C-alpha cells in the first residue's frame, strides 16, 4: 500500500503556526516576568507533564513547615507565660520584703518559693529550646522546594528558548515588522534575526517578538 506523500504546508498554514508559536512565546515571556504566578502557572503546567505535581509538592511542604512552626510556638507559649507570671510575682514579693521586712517564717516561705522557681526554669527553657529547634528544622523544606522551583523555571526557560529558535530559523524575512528610526533608538540595540542562537537577554527577547509583530 502506497503511503500518501506529505505536501508542504502552504504559506497561510505556516503563517498561522508561526503566529501561534509567537503568541505562546510571548505568554511564556510574560509568565517569567511575573514570577510564573496565577494563571500563567496554570497555562505553563499544560505544557509540562508533572508541573502540577511539582507545584502541589511545594505547597504541601510549605504548609507542613508553617504548621510545625505554629504548633511549636503554641506549645512554647504556656511555658513562657508561666515563667513571666511567676517571676513578676516573686519580684513584687521581694520588693515588699525589702521595703518592710516580714517575719522569719514568711521570709522562709519566700525563699522556698524562689528556689522552686529557679528549679523550674531549666525545664521551661529546655522545652522552649526544643520547640525552637523544631521550628528551625522545619525550614529545611526550602532546600527541597527551591530545587523543584528551579527545575520548573529551567524547563520553562528551555521551552522558551526552543520556541525562539524555531522563530529565528523559520520566520520569513518579509514578515518582520519594519521599525521607524525613532522607535529603534528608543528600544536600543536590536536583534540580528538572520542568525540562530543570538538571543542573549530578556530585552532582546522582547525586541525580537516586537519586531516579528507578536
Swiss-Prot record:
The record marks 147 as: Enhances dephosphorylation of CheY-P. Its main location: cytoplasm. Pfam families: CheZ (PF04344). It comes from the Bacteria. Residues 176-199 are annotated as: Disordered. It is found in: Cytoplasm. GO terms for cellular component: bacterial-type flagellum; cytoplasm. One of its GO terms (biological process) is regulation of chemotaxis. Keywords: Chemotaxis, Cytoplasm, Flagellar rotation, Hydrolase, Protein phosphatase. SUPFAM superfamilies: Chemotaxis phosphatase CheZ. Its EC number is 3.1.3.-. GO terms for molecular function: phosphoprotein phosphatase activity. The keyword Cytoplasm applies. Residues 184-193 have a biased composition (Polar residues). Belongs to the CheZ family. Plays an important role in bacterial chemotaxis signal transduction pathway by accelerating the dephosphorylation of phosphorylated CheY (CheY-P). Homodimer. This is Protein phosphatase CheZ.
Amino acid at each position: 500500500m502506497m503511503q500518501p506523500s506529505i505536501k508542504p504546508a502552504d504559506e497561510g498554514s505556516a503563517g498561522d503556526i508561526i503566529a501561534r508559536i509567537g503568541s505562546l512565546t510571548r505568554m511564556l515571556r510574560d509568565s517569567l516576568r511575573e514570577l510564573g504566578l496565577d494563571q500563567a502557572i496554570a497555562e505553563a503546567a499544560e505544557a509540562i507533564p508533572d508541573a502540577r505535581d511539582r507545584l502541589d509538592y511545594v505547597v504541601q511542604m510549605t504548609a507542613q513547615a508553617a504548621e510545625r512552626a505554629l504548633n511549636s510556638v503554641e506549645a512554647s507559649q504556656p511555658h513562657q507565660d508561666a515563667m513571666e507570671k511567676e517571676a513578676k510575682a516573686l519580684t513584687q514579693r521581694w520588693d515588699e520584703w525589702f521595703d518592710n521586712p516580714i517575719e522569719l517564717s514568711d521570709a522562709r516561705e519566700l525563699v522556698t518559693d524562689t528556689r522552686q522557681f529557679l528549679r523550674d526554669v531549666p525545664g521551661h527553657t529546655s522545652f522552649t529550646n526544643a520547640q525552637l529547634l523544631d521550628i528551625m528544622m522545619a525550614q529545611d523544606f526550602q532546600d527541597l522546594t527551591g530545587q523543584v522551583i528551579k527545575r520548573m523555571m529551567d524547563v520553562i526557560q528551555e521551552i522558551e528558548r526552543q520556541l525562539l529558535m524555531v522563530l529565528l530559523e523559520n520566520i520569513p524575512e518579509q514578515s518582520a515588522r519594519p521599525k521607524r528610526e525613532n522607535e529603534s533608538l528608543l528600544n536600543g540595540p536590536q536583534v540580528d534575526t538572520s542568525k540562530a542562537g543570538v538571543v542573549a537577554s530578556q530585552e532582546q527577547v522582547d525586541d525580537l517578538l516586537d519586531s516579528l509583530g507578536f
